[in-house]
Design a protein with these regions (language model features):
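Beta-propeller domains
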Residues: 1-486
Length: 486
């Protein structure tokens, strides 16, 4: 445990470019080098883990920090910045105490006794707008709602009392055809339970369907893919330590290099017992680009590496083995008419070493052409664009001292062709120690940024984010009970 509540760990996760920021700010008219296209009108939201106090344990995982949301509001060639902490129950308790009270990642046995039984949500993994509120998401908790304009925390969000389980994935998908939020929660009947609940939330903000099933073994069920008729779940062996393991000081998750992986295909609006499981040899995936169907075949595009990609969750009792970190965008194809439980094929789609995949969100669940990835080799200073029709990948790289973050696609208009728009991507300038925002023509990133937005502060590296056009960047309309007015 830390010796002082004012001492930050002397580790790579809390020093240099990763040092805490903790700045809640409003900065209008950020400096821009280049020209921001006038058509860009909306907000780029992102969220990072930014501890407000030094952690109780210096060697904890890096993402066990308070959610800090940043909004970049684009309008008329100008950009304004707003950053706010998500005011979770946990955040407010620690702010009142003036120190960290919660212990290791997902380990309640390491908490200060004063917070026993309190919600441990950090709301720090992803943000997106649905039903007129900005949802801050983390997979071990319900969402937290924020006002899309002010970033004021509105409170815990259970979809008007209809959330079917205690958790909600950070990687919910928005169906571009129906407007439904497609989500799930794992460990849905308690920590380390194999139970998963999939659910659909209508644009009116209520769960309209839910189905329960069990995964083959407990694992971190981090992401999913959707098609018009199916939801697809990868299960890879980032397995749980169990309660006794947590009490002994193990991390919540650890890698198992021997177990098979599984891919579950469940009919949307179906029953849990209709899920079909396919298996493949041991390998790793975390984040999903897209999924789509071709007759009775389902294609699932995800970033795959031969071994564990999470250095903070090594095999229990062993140091992290980096030998399997060559991660590439890969297509897994399964045939629902086949009696075979294996994958029909696995196809590497690019040789670019990349993760944090994003496509044009209007094409979620559909056949698609364009995808973008964060370079995941060396200093992680590159952006890749994959053209699946032409089978080519173009790359742009920042200086080696400037690590980049997850890309996000901005469509030129809601009815523009796929890929017609821009990519926005943040980076940390290792020379100035300030954050910058780069804007690229989406299908010509190799030419470099059209514009670079210069921040007067350094923000913590963010995990995920989303774009919302101006029509959705509106104040939340709530009644006295905090319920969204439809």
């Amino acid at each position: 445990m830390q010796d002082s509540k004012h001492t930050w760990p002397d580790s790579p996760w809390f020093t240099g470019l990763n040092a805490p920021c903790r700045v809640e700010a409003d900065v209008n008219d950020l400096d821009v080098v280049g020209t921001i296209p006038a058509e860009i009108d909306g907000a780029f939201y992102r969220v990072a883990a930014d501890h407000q106090f030094p952690p109780r344990f210096a060697n904890d995982v890096p993402f066990n920090g308070d959610g800090m949301v940043s909004m970049f509001r684009f309008h008329d060639g100008r950009v304004h910045l707003k950053t706010r902490y998500v005011q979770t129950d946990r955040f407010k308790a620690e702010r009142a105490a003036g120190r960290a009270l919660f212990g290791r990642y997902r380990n309640k046995w390491t908490d200060d006794p004063s917070v026993a039984g309190m919600n441990r949500n950090l709301a720090n993994t992803n943000v997106l707008i649905h039903h007129g509120v900005l949802l801050a998401l983390r997979e071990d908790s319900p969402p937290v709602a924020l006002d899309p304009v002010t970033l004021q925390t509105l409170g815990n969000w259970d979809f008007h009392g209809t959330l079917p389980g205690p958790t909600c994935s950070a990687h919910c998908k928005i169906d571009p055809h129906t407007g439904n939020l497609v989500g799930f929660g794992f460990g849905a009947k308690g920590d380390f339970s194999r139970d998963v609940v999939y659910f659909e939330v209508s644009p009116q903000g209520r769960v309209i369907h839910a189905a329960w099933f069990q995964m083959p073994y407990f694992a971190e069920q981090h992401d999913c893919g959707i098609t018009p008729n199916y939801i697809v779940f990868p299960v890879v062996p980032i397995i749980g330590a169990g309660e006794e393991g947590l009490k002994k000081g193990l991390t919540y998750y650890g890698w198992d290099p021997k177990r098979e992986i599984h891919l579950g295909v469940l009919p949307r609006f179906g029953r849990g017992d209709q899920i079909r499981w396919f298996t493949a040899p041991n390998q790793f995936t975390s984040h999903v680009m897209n999924a789509w169907e071709d007759g009775r075949r389902v294609h699932f595009d995800t970033c795959v590496s031969p071994g564990n990609l999470f250095p903070f969750f090594p095999e229990f009792g062993k140091p992290f083995d980096p030998s399997g970190m060559s991660v590439k965008l890969t297509r897994w194809t399964v045939n629902l008419d086949s009696g075979d439980a294996g994958f029909e094929r696995a196809t590497t789609l690019t040789d670019f070493i990349g993760e944090f995949p994003r496509n044009d969100d209007r094409f979620q669940g559909k056949p698609y052409r364009h995808g973008w990835l964060l370079g995941f080799s060396g200093p992680r200073n590159s952006l890749g664009h994959v053209d699946l029709h032409e089978g080519r990948t173009e790359v742009w790289s920042a200086p080696a001292t400037h690590p980049v973050m997850e890309p996000c696609f901005i469509p030129r208009s809601q009815d523009a062709p796929e890929g017609d728009g821009w990519i926005v991507q943040a980076l940390t300038n290792g020379e100035t120690m300030l954050t910058e925002l780069n804007l690229f023509e989406a299908t010509n990133i190799a030419r470099g940024p059209l514009a670079t937005v210069k921040l007067p502060v350094r923000l913590r590296p963010a995990y995920h984010g989303s774009w919302a056009e101006s029509a959705r960047v509106k104040p939340a309309r709530l009644n006295a009970e905090g319920v969204k007015l439809c």
